[in-house]
């Protein structure tokens, strides 16, 4: 079985890691030219480039013109010519420390005209040029020797591939190129599993071997109607896709409501087998990550739980308002916290409070979920409801209820296990045995 993703999103990662735990997957393919894919995943746009050695580029190592200056912090960086911004540096996703993934170069009017794409080996492996209207025109991919290997025309959609000692190959679109790539790998493509109805579905639909048996994993909401391509899967006997897995229970039930009963056996509800990084140790230690000094009811919560240590971390300097929290003996502050320090704090804490206003910092709720922290918050501040059980979200006026929930969870192992069970169930967690058995049934194994 081959996994096929448009991009390595959080949803793709959850599916990939769940399948990896079962041992059922042969290979994962990501169409997006992502230079920071983890080991075990391939992109057709980077596969032929030959990069295998090197370290990621640190933000201040980006080549710039004389007298231009690189300015950056833990969140972003830019390149300036005196006072004019000439480029924006994008970091690799996740908890990585200022590692360069993309540089957007601007003209004197501030429009992006060129984007340099970097990989985890510190190389600029591709360059995209843009029109005056900021529309992508062309992406050129170069190999480890600096030779042009791939050229993608974003206007016409065609792709040119030039391999050493071979004639140039022309592909009219991504579907043709990806189909060639899968054939070139000389692997069994009789079963594809994919998670969007865009390019991956079209690869399945146009695959020359019509005898295959593919699976769609639908990870998006459903509203008033079934998408057209999903309807095609349900109604046609001539498509390779035979089953539709829906991880979210509410979305699965909505799919049944929107379709005729005769199609219901094509839908399967199956969540994810998440890869938790550690156990919860029932420690009286709570973590808050924030980009703001507006933390809802933090004084009241800290005062009501004097035996709980509250660790508040920010990647910037803290305001005097936050620094005043040091008057509470059970509060510890971490300003200008590095990604490494934040990872340490996740290891120290067993509760996460999603109570900061403004933006979420470094996918904090998801990170807390992966570290098996019990997550609680307020409806007025919640950043990611997917990983927080509904019983653990409160109105900002319900401080007493939140405090009592924390006390109950910390009272004994069974109470914490029950609270974490609600959290996992809400996030569609499935134990490995059930996940493996269900997936094998879907795949026909």
Swiss-Prot record:
Pathway where it operates: Protein modification; protein glycosylation
GO CC field: plasma membrane; protein N-acetylglucosaminyltransferase complex
Keyword annotations of the record: Cell membrane, Membrane
Membrane topology: Peripheral membrane protein
Free-text note regarding domains: The N-terminus of the protein, including the glycosyltransferase 1 domain (residues 1-171), is required but not sufficient for full formation of the stable GtfA-GtfB complex; the complex of GtfA with truncated GtfB has intermediate N-acetylglucosaminyl transferase activity.
Protein family according to the UniProt entry: Belongs to the GtfB family.
Function text: Required for the polymorphic O-glycosylation of the serine-rich repeat protein PsrP. A stabilizing protein that is part of the accessory SecA2/SecY2 system specifically required to export serine-rich repeat cell wall proteins encoded upstream in the same operon. The GtfA-GtfB complex adds GlcNAc from UDP-GlcNAc to PsrP, attaching the first sugar residue. Stabilizes the glycosylation activity of GtfA. Has no N-acetylglucosaminyl transferase activity on its own.
Additional notes on this entry: Encoded in RD10, a pathogenicity island with an atypical GC content that is associated with invasive pneumococcal disease. Pathogenicity islands account for greater than half the genomic diversity observed between isolates. The main function of this island seems to be correct synthesis and export of pneumococcal serine-rich repeat protein PsrP.
Matching NCBIfam families: accessory Sec system glycosylation chaperone GtfB
UniProt-recorded name of the protein: UDP-N-acetylglucosamine--peptide N-acetylglucosaminyltransferase stabilizing protein GtfB
Gene name in the database record: gtfB
